[in-house]
Amino acid sequence: MMSLSVRPQRRLLSARVSRSQSFAGVLGSQERGPRNFTVFSPPGPQRKPLVLSRVSRMFSVAHPAPKVPQPERLDLVYAALKRGLTAYLEVHQQEQEKLQRQIKESKRNSRLGFLYDLDKQVKSIERFLRRLEFHASKIDELYEAYCVQRRLRDGAYNMVRAYSTGSPGSREARDSLAEATRGHREYTESMCLLENELEAQLGEFHLRMKGLAGFARLCVGDQYEICMKYGRQRWKLRGRIESSGKQVWDSEETVFLPLLTEFLSIKVTELKGLANHVVVGSVSCETKDLFAALPQVVAVDINDLGTIKLSLEVIWSPFDKDDQPSAASTVNKASTVTKRFSTYSQSPPDTPSLREQAFYNMLRRQEELENGTAWSLSSESSDDSSSPQLSGTARYSSTPKPLVQQPEPLPVQVTFRRPESLSSGSMDEEPPLTPALVNGHAPYSRTLSHISEASVDAALTEAMEAVDLKCPAPGPSPLVYPESTHVEHVSSVPPVADNGRSATSPALSTAGPAPTFIDPASSTQLDLVHKATDSGSSELPSITHTMASSTYSAVSPINSVPGLTSTTVGSTHKPMPSPLTSTGSIPSVTDSIQTTTSPTHTTPSPTHTTVSPTHSTPSPTHTTVSPSNAALSPSNATPSLSHSTTSPTQKATMSTHTTSAVGPVQTTTSPISTTVSPSPSVDTAIISSSSAVPSVPGPEARPCSHPTSTPYTKADPTAACTSSPSLASSGPKPLTSPAPDSLEQILKSPSSSPSSIVPEPQRSELSLALVAQAPVPEATGGAGDRRLEEALRTLMAALDDYRGQFPELQGLEQEVTRLESLLMQRQGLTRSRASSLSITVEHALESFSFLNDDEDEDNDSPGDRPTSSPEVVAEERLDSSNAQCLSTGCSALDATLVQHLYHCSCLLLKLGTFGPLRCQEAWALERLLREARVLQEVCEHSKLWGNAVTSAQEVVQFSASRPGFLTFWDQCTEGLNPFLCPVEQVLLTFCSQYGARLSLRQPGLAEAVCVKFLEDALGQKLPRRPHSGPGEQLTIFQFWSYVEVLDSPSMEAYVTETAEEVLLVQNLNSDDQAVVLKALRLAPEGRLRKDGLRALSSLLVHGNSKVMAAVSTQLRSLSLGPVFRERALLCFLDQLEDEDVQTRVAGCLALGCIKAPEGIEPLVYLCQTDTEAVREAARQSLQQCGEEGQSAHRQLEESLDALPCLFGPSSMASTAF
């Protein structure tokens, strides 16, 4: 039994029903009789039951084709579908081999009908397996075509944005823009059509109602209605609890067509009377986990507490009902042979008939084709009968003659986990992860026989996986080809698959436009190569021999080279010699092995062989893996290609070659070491950027100078890649340059290397703390200076997405364009917008470079393709590093602008909020207007960019006299550049200046006041614990823009007022009731700012009755003042958008206390969408908002039965009962 992952929706009502009878069972189909009602049938006389089938199909209306493609969702469904198809193949292959073994083990006294029945089932399963393989290949073709269209669409999007950002005026540019737009639309339509076609290949879900289960919830006479919605498909059924405790339902089964983008919505209603129904619960369930080979019994929690569960039996069929093969149910049903076995007589026949002899002759020929086992017509029984029988070898052996010498394999049980007997000693072995066979139906789970060794694929698989099995002594092991077709297939090395995970042979190193899907469970496979060498040196000879005997079972044309490159795995073990000999067309490799050594000890290891479902394929291109060279990022689980060293006499061929097969990598022979890590995670990029990009200037004064671009002259140009302008270290990820789906797209062409492409950031939700951690680049040229240019492109691309939606952003857009033009003029770049447009278009055209790679793959083989020369690669990197970057002439000012530009990009992500909750959006627009003023101030002083700045007064001036503030900033930046100041320095300066005076009021008050000042100025919460890497920094413009909007006339007045507010908040949060009540009585209206109002609202939730009454009275009295009421209204409405549930509850209760009619619409919205606690508080507040609020509450209650809930709590999960 398994539990279906639930995406719960909001409950319509909080119905509390207390009863005392538990669920007593589910009525079986035999006891229910032939009762069947049509879906959505009204109460009344029963309709005539269907004669042909009891299953009703719920897809009379076709599902509409999507208008917007969803590639991320399709990737998830495709991976689940592949796992399900692989499970189907494995289960039926095991069933087929079980039947074949029954045929081989049959005695001569078995009658013809028994063997004929077995053979008929084997043939039926073979046809079904061929059908499954064809179906899987068709799905793979659709997915590959979809991936091609996706990449073409991304490239067209880059072209459209490249042409639109430049605002070209020529006719040719307008025509090009129109053509790119038309191409983007066509690719989008193609993706939608392919999604629809792939959706048609998902098969069917057969759902069978098992019943409701609930402890102390179900009573005799209760009637329930269950409505399931899956896209446009519906299934509504009604049932009741009878006196015996059994359940009777008017509909038993249905069929749903799987959908890509829809979730299964289940709503359970208790029918109490005429138009008096109580909604028990409504949930949405994920259906991608239902692609399994065996039936599954799933349990879904209907209500919040899980006291009501819906039990369904789900059977997935990979084909439609109209096109269902006859052998689809052979595994799920009892074998026909088992049923008929008792009907056959066990007495031996006297004389075999001609029909029997022909049948045995057919079996003999088939056996000879498989493994050369001969049939004998000689009688070996005691009754001297002439009935044909198996020879002694085939008759008395439980398994056929093995192709690879190894003991009898252990049986494999189809369960959630692999058998524990498979150790982790092998190099190719996987960790104990969830296998492709996903099933949780206990009655159907059984022990299936192991895959027969008569198959070469099974033999090779066992040779690579069963490391703990005892292997024979090393020596030549001649192999027998079971079929002649295997040798013919080896010449064309196809992609291989292993356990449901796609892999690619090294012979196809430039494989296909479609990226290989990376299973989440396979992200740690590269570490297994290192762990495999630590399992003990005694296992290495056994592994080596097993791999050798299985590797040379086929001949590859690539092996025609005179030498054979050996594989070396860096390890701490001593070198273990492993002689590999082979007979046949492959020469001996004892004298021609080329050893590639690593900095650590070297251990020769066997050839890594990939196994395809139909034949074996040796891999002549071997892997060189070293713990000191091969790096794997632990956060993003993306293998990074490391140092590849060549010599005139020896070459090390590197390729990513694991069972997950992230992607084939082109052979690297350049002496220049390369480190490629596509799409790194934010945390990893930040940690690594501390060594690549210099940090804040030191205590000594550093004059601002023009940056000089110097080429990289280090022997290890890895820094050119690691310190390249990566926006992941301080801002959003690239948007225009989509991350390649495999490493081969990066290594294949130098034009797509990270050092030559300046990616443009994506709109991804990042915390503001990461933006504030942007380190200051030195004025030494190189990749660090490109951060300003990247930040400009990021913000301009984000502003293009919001163009025309918010008029407030027009000023910010003008200032960004003005800043870009001033920077270009300062660098002496006289290029026009059209010329810069051509460069942008040139970068966008690189999105289509994979089309040329596909043509090269069709024309040339991987072995014949020349690699890029080291001189060309070095020259291109020097050219890219020598490119002149945008800069103001001062590295500190550049870093300041970068921080502001990225802050603007993050603020833009808060715009476009759905629903009536718009406080965060209004706050973001206000901050963006302040950032526009900052950019305006910077642009107005562009003539002074190159001058040395020593004080804050040379940079900013307040509109009104505010003594003390600029002096305080100069004290903070003493010895530093005045543009930037670390927050730690601000805190130290503040405590040294005001700590003595504030500590008289309360110890630690100075730190609390300074932290509040920094958080308000930065617009984010500061971390309470120190962390590694560069800390947050406050710019002079953030300091200036925050002080401009303050009401305090001087620094001294601000410190005094803020200290009073901090003390008030601390008293309100005190655990002493007397302190809280005293603070409420003495709280003046002016000191209740945002933090004080939040503290008051929290008392409405966590305080006792006396404190809650005092808070309500205080809020009602203070809300009479218009200034306080406006401030409190904005604060409490902002709390409704907080992530914390208790904060939202407090905001709802506080809005009820001040009786704000402005909050009626947000409160109604929360009643429909939020959790139960928030909905209850919102209803209570609506009733306190006068007549208008009470009317809205009545309308809400009346519409609860008709309006479905929109969202659900993400913390809820279903449990199996």
Curated annotation (Swiss-Prot):
Gene Ontology CC terms, in alphabetical order: cytoplasm; Golgi apparatus; membrane
Sequence positions bearing Phosphoserine: 22, 345, 347, 452, 455, 742, 868-869
Domain of life, per lineage: Eukaryota
Gene Ontology molecular function terms on file: 14-3-3 protein binding
Keywords for this protein: Coiled coil, Cytoplasm, Golgi apparatus, Phosphoprotein
UniProt-annotated location(s): Cytoplasm; Golgi apparatus
Regions of compositional bias (Low complexity) in chain numbering: 376-391, 400-413, 595-649, 664-695
Single biological process term from Gene Ontology: Rho protein signal transduction
Biased composition (Acidic residues): 852-861
SUPFAM superfamilies linked to this entry: ARM repeat
InterPro entries: ARM-like, ARM-type_fold, FAM65_N, RIPOR3
Pfam families: PL48
Biased segments, Polar residues type: 579-594, 650-661, 720-729
Family of this protein: Belongs to the RIPOR family.
PANTHER family, per database record: PROTEIN KINASE PKN/PRK1, EFFECTOR, RHO FAMILY-INTERACTING CELL POLARIZATION REGULATOR 1
Subunit and interaction comment: Interacts (via N-terminus) with RHOA (GTP-bound form); this interaction links active RHOA to STK24 and STK26 kinases. Interacts with RHOB. Interacts with RHOC. Interacts (via C-terminus) with PDCD10; this interaction occurs in a Rho-independent manner. Interacts (via C-terminus) with STK24; this interaction occurs in a PDCD10-dependent and Rho-independent manner. Interacts (via C-terminus) with STK26; this interaction occurs in a PDCD10-dependent and Rho-independent manner. Interacts (via N-terminus) with 14-3-3 proteins; these interactions occur in a Rho-dependent manner.
Reported function: Downstream effector protein for Rho-type small GTPases that plays a role in cell polarity and directional migration. Acts as an adapter protein, linking active Rho proteins to STK24 and STK26 kinases, and hence positively regulates Golgi reorientation in polarized cell migration upon Rho activation. Involved in the subcellular relocation of STK26 from the Golgi to cytoplasm punctae in a Rho- and PDCD10-dependent manner upon serum stimulation.
Protein name (record): Rho family-interacting cell polarization regulator 1
